[in-house]
Amino acid sequence: MLIKYNTRVDIHSMFHLVKGLYNNWNSKEHYSILILGLDNAGKTTFLETLKKEFSMASKDLNKIAPTVGQNVAQIPMDNNKTILKLWDVGGQETLRSMWTEYYHQCHGIIFVIDSTDRSRIDEWSDALRSIIVDDEVEGVPVLMLANKQDRPDTMEIQDIKQIFNQIAEHISARDSRVLPISALTGVGVREAADWLVVRLQRNKESRPPIYK
């Protein structure tokens, strides 16, 4: 008994199989990251310095204005295998209601504080608490950046960590960390990005990246 094969169909199927394997092998992991925090915390300066760290065109740090709306940048990491799409969203009180619109699509959150401004501790604490208790970001890695460490009048990093831990102690288990940085000088900026990439990849089952 002779079995006839549809050679045309077999070749077509093989082509799509090979194409799918090729695309899967060569696709990159894309993660959306929110950069949040009060106004004047240094969010945009952090973003621009991060771009500069990875040899991307960036703005003059002396000409950065308060963000009204959002700034967006894509930064390749991990030998170009991972792409971070960073959303720097305005931190003025009237703009914070916009933050929730981004929660459902984010894979990680960077929360930036001005560690020299003791008068706004309660304000940024309340803002951070409102973020991490939201069901839309359950399980999402949270990285707090204690910015402006180049200044002599910064709070002790241990005091900032204590405040963060008091906020985070009642939420579901997730990766979180407090890092001291200076967005102006670049100290700690790359370390922050590297930490976040590792946590995003650990969290892939809960928040899968977009492959393309």
Describe the predicted segments one by one.
Residues L2-K212:
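TRAFAC-class small GTPase G-domain
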